[in-house]
Regions:
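Catalytic domains of carbohydrate-active enzymes, especially glycoside hydrolases
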Residues: 52-79, 182-187, 283, 287-289, ...
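Substrate-binding cleft of secreted/luminal carbohydrate-active enzymes
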Residues: 278-304, 319-395
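Polysaccharide-binding and catalytic clefts of secreted carbohydrate-active enzymes
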Residues: 66-67, 117, 146-289, 298
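Active-site clefts of carbohydrate-active enzymes
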Residues: 31-33, 37, 245-269, 311-348
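Active-site-adjacent "subsite" loops/lids of carbohydrate-active enzymes
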Residues: 24, 32, 36-52, 112, ...
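The substrate-binding groove and active-site-proximal loops of carbohydrate-active enzymes
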Residues: 37-48, 88-104, 154-173, 215-227, ...
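Glycine-rich, aromatic-flanked loop segments that form ligand/cofactor-binding clefts
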Residues: 21-28, 66-77, 106-153, 189-192, ...
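Aromatic-lined carbohydrate-binding/catalytic grooves of carbohydrate-active enzymes
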Residues: 64-101
Length: 395
């Protein structure tokens, strides 16, 4: 009798758990190419080895239940595809401007292999980062920083496009237009890097641009208006080229702290989208300029300054009818005490699935899954992602 009851208990709760799995859900992973974080493993491997690595990566994520990959194709004003505007990436071939050997189009290859597995391919591009490290980056003479040095500003050890320059806004838009017009990408995806994160004691050196284009605004509002302008331009050109291509943004997890704005979250983040990165994500959602938002909530539940639960609930109330996916910091499993807790990721998945207006998740990043941290690959494959999910439709 006890054995029978135990069997019935397992059957009942097994069915209940299965029934709770969403039938529509983004299950994606970021694949970072900058500094060869995730792919390729080295900039010196051959094209054939690159292809084999990407296929292995895709197969792993498909087995784990993912239905999309977000692949970085433009890490620093360079390209993982033949571009008429920017050189081949140093993280692809070891030397910026040098094509892969034997020659192939990595972006087309990755899209084809991804779609073959019925997964979405989101093309991840960094809008303003031009030189990753001014001390040791490989820069070809045909790089745009050499052709138009007046468009760029150095800050810390990096070089950035000047977001206030109208020419820069047009150029960034042209780069995105080129990709959407030639490739069957399911989305253009930008991350949190708009204006750079502040460096203590250093001001971003855009005074000359502000004097030229400021138009009577204060500098903070002017900077936000620059970011707004390029988002509007990108939104329009993406839909003109392919009305089915999504435009998604994955911002830093805090829009504003509540002590700065009553509409902000109950957090104490040292920097925020609105006040420091000059990215007014809520405006873009309200205006319908972007199709989805994927805030990077890499903190754990109970974090004293940016609690996961507090933030996911805040974002769920501020989607403005657009799809909202949660960026999960699985990479922290090896270095953060809270993330060494085997229940941290399962609890976060359960929380997001039980929070209104949240339509899925994106994991940062791909390489972490190679180690099966805390056995979470198995948890996804055998439990949380056991049943396939349809991809959310664009709203």
């Amino acid at each position: 009798m006890i054995k029978l009851m135990a069997i019935l208990f397992l059957v009942f709760f097994g069915i209940t758990a299965s029934a709770q799995v969403p039938r529509v859900e983004l299950r994606a992973v970021w694949v970072a190419t900058v500094s060869n974080i995730d792919f390729p493993s080295s900039p010196t491997i051959s094209s054939d080895v690159q292809k084999a690595e990407f296929i292995k990566l895709l197969n792993m994520h498909q087995q784990n239940g993912m239905n999309a990959v977000v692949v970085q194709i433009r890490p620093a004003t360079d390209a993982f595809y033949p571009s008429p505007l920017e050189p081949w990436s140093q993280w692809l071939t070891g030397i910026q401007g040098q094509p892969p050997v034997p020659y192939y189009d990595p972006l087309q290859f990755m899209i084809t292999e991804t779609h073959k597995r019925k997964m979405e391919f989101h093309a991840w591009m960094n809008p303003y980062r031009a030189v990753f490290n001014i001390n040791n980056s490989s820069i070809t003479p045909t790089h745009i920083t050499k052709i138009h040095p007046e468009w760029f500003l150095s800050y810390g050890d990096k070089k950035y496009f000047d977001p206030g320059s109208k020419e820069v806004q047009k150029f960034v838009t042209a780069v995105v237009k080129d990709v959407v017009s030639r490739y069957d990408v399911d989305a253009i995806h930008f991350d949190d890097y708009f204006y750079p994160y502040r460096i203590a004691g250093k001001e971003f050196p855009d005074d000359a641009s502000f004097r030229k284009y400021g138009g009577g605004m204060n500098k903070e509002d002017w900077r936000r208006s620059n970011t707004d302008s390029v988002i509007v331009m990108l939104s329009r050109v993406i839909k003109q080229e392919n009305k089915n291509c999504q435009f998604g943004i994955s911002p830093f997890g805090v829009w504003r702290n509540a002590d700065k704005d009553v509409n902000g979250s109950n957090t104490k983040a040292g920097q925020t989208n609105y006040d420091d990165l000059y990215a007014d994500i809520l405006l873009w959602l309200k205006k319908g300029w972007i199709d989805y938002v994927a805030p990077q909530l890499y903190w754990e539940m109970g974090h004293d300054k940016a609690d996961f639960n507090t933030l996911i609930e805040w974002w769920s109330k501020n989607t403005f009818g657009k799809n909202c996916y949660i960026g999960l910091g699985i990479y922290r499993a090896g270095s953060n005490a809270a993330w060494k807790d085997k229940t941290q990721l399962p609890r976060q998945i359960e929380k997001l699935r039980n929070t209104p207006n949240i339509s899925g998740m994106i994991f940062f990043s791909s390489k972490t899954f190679e180690k099966n941290p805390n056995g979470w690959n198995d948890s996804l494959r055998l439990n949380y992602f056991k049943e396939p999910a349809a991809l959310p439709v664009m709203r």
